[in-house]
Amino acid sequence: MNQQLIPAIKVKDLSFYYNTSKAIEGISMDIYRNKVTAIIGPSGCGKSTFIKTLNRISELEGPVKVEGVVDFFGQNIYDPRININRLRRQIGMVFQRPNPFPMSIYENVAYGVRISAKLPQADLDEIVESALKGAALWQEVKDKLNKSALGLSGGQQQRLCIARALAIKPKVLLMDEPCSALDPIATMKVEELIHSLRSELTIAIVTHNMQQATRVSDFTAFFSTDESRIGQMVEFGVTTQIFSNPLDSRTRDYVSGRFG
């Protein structure tokens, strides 16, 4: 990793509350452009909460409060003047369980594009095909684009959700445990997809699977909790260093399987 590292997202002293209950505290880290950053840690340490703060989708879950800064290419996403819809187009999200819409495969991918722009049909067709190819799904569905997305396998549905995110051309893709509901073969396909997308996108992935983190990521952040069960980032670094020579004993205990 000798090339210059450019942060796509800079998180500075971030704390996040659901109502008045603090979920994560004092997190500072960079998510580098065209790199994959894994976020690991035991259940309940704030991994998913953290990743949802990066495009403000956490605000859909109820009243929240945020302290600190999340800088996205030079702009604080919590600035009250920010256009949240535009932000969420630039920072896409793939969730733990596949969530295809109850419509055709084609319309699933076209959905976000239709909302943001009125395009000629030929242009829309091209975007849908490109997104499905980007999600390594085109060859499997090109002859059944008008069939219901609900008829796809779980792994295909997850790649469809990735295609749906890719169609609106985000700069960053957030992935919250994207393989937890998938079988090993479907998981392998998603991991291969992550490898292929890193040249075009910045990716942050939450995973419980430490082997997956070592396979797909360039950088890793280890989260844990304090005595009050508030999530904190313990250590951040190059993935090989985090897993082979962590600096903090808590990280060492976690990656060696002593707790978590």
UniProtKB/Swiss-Prot annotation:
Its EC number is 7.3.2.1. It is an enzyme of class 7 (translocase). ATP binds at G41, P42, S43, G44, C45, G46, K47, S48. GO terms for molecular function: ATP binding; ATP hydrolysis activity; ATPase-coupled phosphate ion transmembrane transporter activity. It is a peripheral membrane protein. Residues 9-255 form the ABC transporter domain. It is found in: Cell inner membrane. The keyword Transmembrane does not apply. GO terms for cellular component: plasma membrane. Keywords: ATP-binding, Cell inner membrane, Cell membrane, Membrane, Nucleotide-binding, Phosphate transport, Translocase, Transport. It catalyses: phosphate(out) + ATP + H2O = ADP + 2 phosphate(in) + H(+). Pfam families: ABC_tran (PF00005). Part of the ABC transporter complex PstSACB involved in phosphate import. Responsible for energy coupling to the transport system. Belongs to the ABC transporter superfamily. Phosphate importer (TC 3.A.1.7) family. The complex is composed of two ATP-binding proteins (PstB), two transmembrane proteins (PstC and PstA) and a solute-binding protein (PstS). This is Phosphate import ATP-binding protein PstB 5. It comes from Trichormus variabilis (strain ATCC 29413 / PCC 7937). The lineage of its organism: Bacteria, Bacillati, Cyanobacteriota, Cyanophyceae, Nostocales.
